[in-house]
Amino acid sequence: KARVGFKAGVKDYRLTYYTPEYENKDTDILAAFRVTPQPGVPAEEAAAAVAAESSTGTWTTVWTDGLTSLDRYKGRCYHIEAVVGEENQYIAYVAYPLDLFEEGSVTNMFTSIVGNVFGFXXXRALRLEDLRIPPAYSKTFQGPPHGIQVERDKLNKYGRPLLGCTIKPKLGLSAKNYGRAVYECLRGGLDFTKDDENVNSQPFMRWRDRFLFCAEALYKAQAETGEIKGHYLNATAGTCEEMIKRAVFARELGVPIVMHDYLTGGFTANTTLAHYCRDNGLLLHIHRAMHAVIDRQKNHGMHFRVLAKALRMSGGDHIHSGTVVGKLEGEREMTLGFVDLLRDDYIEKDRSRGIFFTQDWVSMPGVLPVASGGIHVWHMPALTEIFGDDSVLQFGGGTLGHPWGNAPGAVANRVALEACVQARNEGRDLASEGNEIIREACSW
């Protein structure tokens, strides 16, 4: 009888993939998962299963395991802690060796870490809470096309948040009327106007017509106000080739910024566009359409801070990041946590703000967070205080809903912003005096 060189059959994941004695390396990618095991499954087994299925493991021992070094390539669950106040929920920390990932590919990183494991039978629910991206990996990415400082220099705007506005109604306007709305907003004092995320190239308004009329509006408003203006021209399309075609046309028109829906468009398309934008001097505005499908559930999916980190690596100069005060959900501390992850170079671990790992971006350019969704002029003091100068505040209905029209709505927002920034610089407290500051500004 031939002797078999390995022991076939199913064995517990924790025997191989749960290694509490492991000391993680500086080059490891670290992940924090919120694991809810099925009833009767021990936490160690569920956590080890997550590490296995998102790296080298499969459900049984295979003879080809002998042809490689599992110790070198396997993901390891190195720590488990129970979640306070939740029954049968754990945070599992997993370390992945750098060799498991293709350089410069967010697509590959996500395919590995969250690709397969979320449908796994042993886990009842699973959520990726945070990732630590080591410098050895982040240095393989270009990151944002330009970053915060270069954007301010391009626009010649300093010392205050930037103001934007999404053109509404988002669908149904003709290109000429759309351009007219853009012009009115920019003339009134906004820095940017924005295509809605679902404005691509529909029968009522084809992309080329929209680009032309918006460019005309832009230049007319610039000539009148003496300020540099921008309109986020949405280049998102059905294919990468078509997307780049639209970005090329935007560049030929000489406009400063284009836009992409990075989750529906996909990370491969987004990284492609980010590279084009850096090579051609375009700023890139990123919308997070579809994020709530992934990040809304508290115990399953992925936290937005992970999607935000991925975007900084893939590339974007602005990204929508919730408002803390408007119509869309977002807790203040958590939101500020990932806003810092977008803007700052070095962020300390701080569990109260949802930051599980210290993250060093080693001088990768920062991304401007965009506050957008149900905010209006009375929120301005709170927004100025919460987000600070390096942000874009976007008022859609809060501009266009003004009873006198778009331009007066834009004027109202600009006046409120300037008043809040001036009051803050004079040492007044925006939290307590905010409404008073806005009322004073009304009488200018």
Curated annotation (Swiss-Prot):
* Identification of the protein by name: Ribulose bisphosphate carboxylase large chain
Gene it is expressed from: rbcL
Record-stated family? Belongs to the RuBisCO large chain family. Type I subfamily.
Localization, per the record, is:
Plastid, Chloroplast
Q: Which residues form the active site?
A: K168, H287
Query: Which source organism does the UniProt entry give?
Result: Watsonia angusta
Q: Does the keyword Magnesium apply?
A: yes
Q: Which keywords label this protein?
A: Calvin cycle, Carbon dioxide fixation, Chloroplast, Disulfide bond, Lyase, Magnesium, Metal-binding, Methylation, Monooxygenase, Oxidoreductase, Photorespiration, Photosynthesis, Plastid
Instruction: List ligand-binding residues for substrate.
Output: N116, T166, K170, R288, H320, S372
Where is the PTM N6,N6,N6-trimethyllysine found along the chain?
Answer: K7
NCBIfam families per record: PRK04208.1
Question: GO: which molecular function terms?
Answer: magnesium ion binding; monooxygenase activity; ribulose-bisphosphate carboxylase activity
Residues reported in the UniProt entry to bind Mg(2+):
K194, D196, E197
Describe its assembly: Heterohexadecamer of 8 large chains and 8 small chains; disulfide-linked. The disulfide link is formed within the large subunit homodimers.
Q: Where is the signal peptide?
A: none
What Gene3D superfamilies does the record point to?
Ribulose bisphosphate carboxylase, large subunit, C-terminal domain, RuBisCO large subunit, N-terminal domain
Q: What class does this enzyme belong to in the EC scheme?
A: lyase
Swiss-Prot/TrEMBL cofactor(s): Mg(2+)
Purpose of the protein: RuBisCO catalyzes two reactions: the carboxylation of D-ribulose 1,5-bisphosphate, the primary event in carbon dioxide fixation, as well as the oxidative fragmentation of the pentose substrate in the photorespiration process. Both reactions occur simultaneously and in competition at the same active site.
Biological processes per GO annotation:
photorespiration; reductive pentose-phosphate cycle
Q: What is its EC number?
A: 4.1.1.39
